[in-house]
Amino acid sequence: MIQPQTHLNVADNSGARELMCIRIIGASNHRYAHIGDVIVAVIKEAVPNMPLERSEVIRAVIVRTCKELRRDNGMIIRYDDNAAVVIDQEGNPKGTRVFGAIARELRQLNFTKIVSLAPEVL
C-alpha cells in the first residue's frame, strides 16, 4: 500500500534512485496505490549526469510492494521493497532496463513494454 509521502526505490535505469509519492492517479478517493497503479512522484535521489534530476516531478507505475497481493487463485505475492518504474505521459518507460522481478498483473494493465524489459515476471 503506497500512500502520499511514501518513499520508493526505482526499478529501472532512468537516472532516478529514490522517489516519494505525492499523488495517486485515478479516482479522487484513492487512498492507497497498489501494483499497477500510476502515481505522481518527486525524485528524492538521482544518479549524477543523467537526464532526470533531483526534485523533478514525474509519473511512475508501481511494480513491487511490501503489502501482499492476493490473486484470484488464492496465491499471495509479497516483495521485499516498494519499487516503481518511471514512465512518460503515454505510459512508456523512460529507462531501457528494468531491474528485479515484477508482477504478472502489469501485462493485464497494458504495461507490456515494462513486462518485456523485466528479467523475471512472477
Swiss-Prot record:
Pfam families: Ribosomal_L14. It comes from Liriodendron tulipifera (Tuliptree). NCBIfam families: rplN_bact. Binds to 23S rRNA. Keywords: Chloroplast, Plastid, Ribonucleoprotein, Ribosomal protein, RNA-binding, rRNA-binding. The keyword Transmembrane does not apply. SMART domains: Ribosomal_L14. The lineage of its organism: Eukaryota, Viridiplantae, Streptophyta, Embryophyta, Tracheophyta. GO terms for molecular function: large ribosomal subunit rRNA binding; structural constituent of ribosome. Belongs to the universal ribosomal protein uL14 family. It comes from the Eukaryota. GO terms for biological process: translation. It is found in: Plastid, Chloroplast. Part of the 50S ribosomal subunit. CDD domains: Ribosomal_uL14. Its main location: plastid. One of its GO terms (cellular component) is chloroplast. PANTHER family: 50S/60S RIBOSOMAL PROTEIN L14/L23, LARGE RIBOSOMAL SUBUNIT PROTEIN UL14M. This is Large ribosomal subunit protein uL14c.
